[in-house]
From Swiss-Prot:
Pfam families in UniProt: Bac_DNA_binding
Region named Disordered: 58-92
Keyword Repeat found: no
GO molecular function: DNA binding; structural constituent of chromatin
Annotated protein name in UniProt: DNA-binding protein HU
């Protein structure tokens, strides 16, 4: 797994910027994606993938320790759909 610090270092090296600038850029990217998803917009990066906000329906879940069935409220979550460019890059 790559950590945020490792990602910042990689961005800084590839973009030829210092780590503080890379950290600011990464945090701005994360904030922009989050804001778009909160407002109901998908974030599509052609060749890489699409971030989507989806609503999970309410339902029931089971407590694994007690076996008790509990109601789970509807909630929103984020999904990432891999783009063809990234998929083919991973499989080459």
């Amino acid at each position: 797994m790559t950590t945020k610090a490792e990602l910042v270092t990689a961005i800084a090296e590839k973009a030829g910027i210092n780590k503080n600038q890379a950290k600011d850029a990464l945090e701005a990217f994360i904030e922009a994606v989050t804001d778009s998803l909160k407002s109901g917009q998908d974030v599509r990066l052609v060749g890489f993938g699409t971030f989507k906000a989806v609503t999970r329906a309410a339902g029931t879940a089971r407590n694994p320790r007690t076996g008790e069935t509990v109601n789970r409220p509807a909630s929103k979550t984020a999904r990432f759909q891999v783009g063809e460019g990234l998929k083919s890059s991973l499989n080459s």
